[in-house]
Amino acid sequence: MRYLTAGESHGPQLTAIIEGLPSQLPLGTSDINPWLRKRQGGYGRGRRMVIETDEAQILSGVRAGRTTGAPVTLVIANKDHRNWTEIMSPEPGGEPRKKALTAARPGHADLTGGIKYRHKDLRDVLERASARETAARVAVGAVALKLLSELGVEGANYVASLGGIETRAPFSWDQLDAIEASDLRTPDADAAAQMRERIDQAKKDGDTLGGILEVRFRGLPVGLGSYVHWDRKLDGRIAQACLSVQAMKGVEIGRAFENAVQPGSRVHDAVYYREGTYVRDTNSAGGLEAGMTNGEELIVRVAMKPIATLMKPLPTVNVVTHEAADAARERSDTTAVPAAGVILQCVIGWVLAEAMLEKFGGDTLPELQERVQAARAYAQAY
């Protein structure tokens, strides 16, 4: 499978094309739009989330509620585009340059992207570099999550920490309803209250906050990925996918950083054979060994830096005059940490769905289901 996204933050729409989905997968906008709503949620978001009420349209590849095997085209309209039609016009003219953005924002793509692509109007950089693009990736990921659910795989995400405040309650699959009900995507009510206070203070200060997200998947068959070649190792592919999301700066699988300071005897997960199957009583590895799923729960933690657009701008330079300036201010969030967990579950879900198809193949969902079931039976009897 593969996909491509296109579109700018304030352009008419975001577009995604997915190629390689098996046919006969039940799919409709009701499988995608709830994920888009989750992405827009969370305490600390800005006014853009009020303007946009994201809904996907399926333009190809699905008929009568099932994929056909043809490329699937998804479109998400940018409602705010009506306020930007002249500035974002693709036609030659003076209006776009009248409001040129020339004060590069530290921490953003502005300066480096301007140098790379030779833009002096930095809007030509930020419009595509914007995290608005993640709406398209969530739509794509929602399709992948639908495929995984048809193969018996379930995912979850929550906020492990925000602004230095940690979720102290250990994760449990029984807490999913509480996580979904929380505007901070944490089951820890005390931590959520402290996070809100921290966000409110940051907003008053014109500042932003980052955090750590945890994403989990259960029900994965043994052997997704490979140890044979570097580019087929699933942990590397998951890390790349996570770090490709705007503002994500670090990835941990299992208890990686804690494990780094422990002796091996306290790190590696002992294997036992009980009741006719292989079991581990611990999961320090986070469900991946030597680049392959081992049948345990996949656990991925991702560090998100604070959003780079500040309401109290940092010092920078005007790229036209080279004079000192305050960084440009764009409408932004105080934090998007809760939404980031949703995005990360979707992008990791894509990697896992891709790995499923690579290992098991099949032009149709029934073929794929049969092969996954056979692989699970083999691993059970091994």
Curated annotation (Swiss-Prot):
One of its GO terms (biological process) is chorismate biosynthetic process. One of its GO terms (molecular function) is chorismate synthase activity. Keywords: Amino-acid biosynthesis, Aromatic amino acid biosynthesis, FAD, Flavoprotein, FMN, Lyase, NADP. Reduced FMN (FMNH(2)). NADP(+) binds at R39, R45. Coiled coil: none annotated. Pathway: Metabolic intermediate biosynthesis; chorismate biosynthesis; chorismate from D-erythrose 4-phosphate and phosphoenolpyruvate: step 7/7. Its EC number is 4.2.3.5. Its cofactor is FMNH2. One of its GO terms (cellular component) is cytosol. Belongs to the chorismate synthase family. Homotetramer. This reaction introduces a second double bond into the aromatic ring system. This is Chorismate synthase. It comes from Deinococcus geothermalis (strain DSM 11300 / CIP 105573 / AG-3a). The lineage of its organism: Bacteria, Thermotogati, Deinococcota, Deinococci, Deinococcales.
